[in-house]
Amino acid sequence: MGSSKSKPKDPSQRRRSLEPPDSTHHGGFPASQTPNKTAAPDTHRTPSRSFGTVATELKLFGDFNTSDTVTSPQRAGALAGSVTTFGTRESRIETDLSFKKRERLQIVNNTEGTWWLAHSLTTGQTGYIPSNYVAPSDSIQAEEWYFGKITRRESGRLLLNPENPRGTFLVRESETTKGAYCLSVSDFDNAKGLNVKHYKIRKLDSGGFYITSRTQFSSLQQLVAYYSKHADGLCHRLTNVCPTSKPQTQGLAKDAWEIPRESLRLEVKLGQGYFGEVWMGTWNGTTRVAIKTLKPGTMSPEAFLQEAQVMKKLRHEKLVQLYAMVSEEPIYIVIEYMSKGSLLDFLKGEMGKYLRLPQLVEMAAQIASGMAYVERMNYVHRDLRAANILVGENLVCKVADFGLARLIEDNEYTARPGARFPVKWTAPEAALYGRFTIKSDVWSFGILLTELTTKGRVPYPGMVNGEVLDRVERGYRMPCPPECPESLHDLMCQCWRKDPEERPTFEYLQAQLLPACVLKIAE
């Protein structure tokens, strides 16, 4: 993808079009991935400016460690020899290796990136496997209940799923004591409701482990087995291992970026726009995907494929993943399917009424995590809003719709005259003069926070685009939404500072969005 160089700042640049975008997302594609049941036819890092203008850090929801980051379980390193799988996976193409959960494999070649050649000691077959599905045999990393280096916050998000029974648990590394571990357990009582307890697992000089010194174990496996039978001081005995999503593979399979059209089956239309459609479908009869199509003649193929090139370069657990593409017309872009659709639809739907502030703040933290990565990679999204965030299982949120994203040089990208963008979400310097930076994305994030706290209300209610721009230029900012803490509104207002350089970084924003009130710390 060719990067767009920044233009000189010129106050005389004419104002941009105030035409609102279509109700669909950029390029006329629908933002939602919520099925409407239409049947298918058969057929180098750039340093960010540090945010140092705030004298004291915000404590939005209690004093909590601001070094936390949202991460997923990281279990596999550069392994060799015998490994054990911690998930079941069916082969997707002929060169793949199918395996069952806790199957032993021998690694044959681990020098080809994220796809390794392995031999099954059970079936005798050989093929490629995703490296993040395995761990050294007989190691703690191979245990289903071991989640490694995830944070307190992430463990809380996973365990607070209402479908988890009392006693659902996981073991993770301690964030405060090197070499120690933490047992996180879901609990419920009428006073507190669903909550999480965290118990520090200490290590003996002799190599054993204990939670209370009166009961000691030679291994973590023995500790887990004991507390699965006896509560013995815990809030509840251990019942179920905390469920988590399958590890995300890089691409659909090894060397499967360009795929044949016939390998895709379009099944349910999720929406359509002027330039094309989005479908839920299946690849190779094995893998659920979302497929973006382009109507021939409505847009240059090069412009459409530009989104795929951006997504291929930007890879992070909080960004929707590009899987593959069909680059001959009609062009298809194959991306990760997110089962709950757009965040906007999710907030306004049946599930939205059950979301409470801690969950909304956690969702905001996930979005900030994804955008902090975009920030580090020196890109600008340009269309950050709830309609362009997708939601999956367990309230996982990922930034999507990179059709307007650009690599920025000299910290600024200037849009072409006449470019259209969502005015109510766009920073004044971008809406009026087309000057986009990561700081204009920060402004948009502040607007997105209002969407979260109001369960999807349109920003600046009762105002048209021209009125919004005029009043914002004269200093107007939206008031604190109902039931929103003043400290969170203060964070929004930091995002809406007139001088872009005085707005916070996404890294800072992520650190401030710490829903400590949802975690009942017992360690």
From Swiss-Prot:
Domain SH3: 71-139
Protein's UniProt keywords contain Kinase: yes
Name of one Pfam family that matches: SH3_1
Residue ranges of the region described as Disordered: 1-50
Lipid attachment points (N-myristoyl glycine): G2
Catalytic activity, EC: 2.7.10.2
Ranges of biased composition (kind: Basic and acidic residues): 7-25
Domain Protein kinase: start-end pairs: 264-514
MF-aspect GO terms: ATP binding; non-membrane spanning protein tyrosine kinase activity
Record PTM Phosphotyrosine, positions in chain: Y413
Function: This phosphoprotein, required for both the initiation and the maintenance of neoplastic transformation, is a protein kinase that catalyzes the phosphorylation of tyrosine residues in vitro.
Subunit structure: Homodimer.
Protein's UniProt name: Tyrosine-protein kinase transforming protein Src
Lineage: Viruses, Riboviria, Pararnavirae, Artverviricota, Revtraviricetes
Gene name as annotated: V-SRC
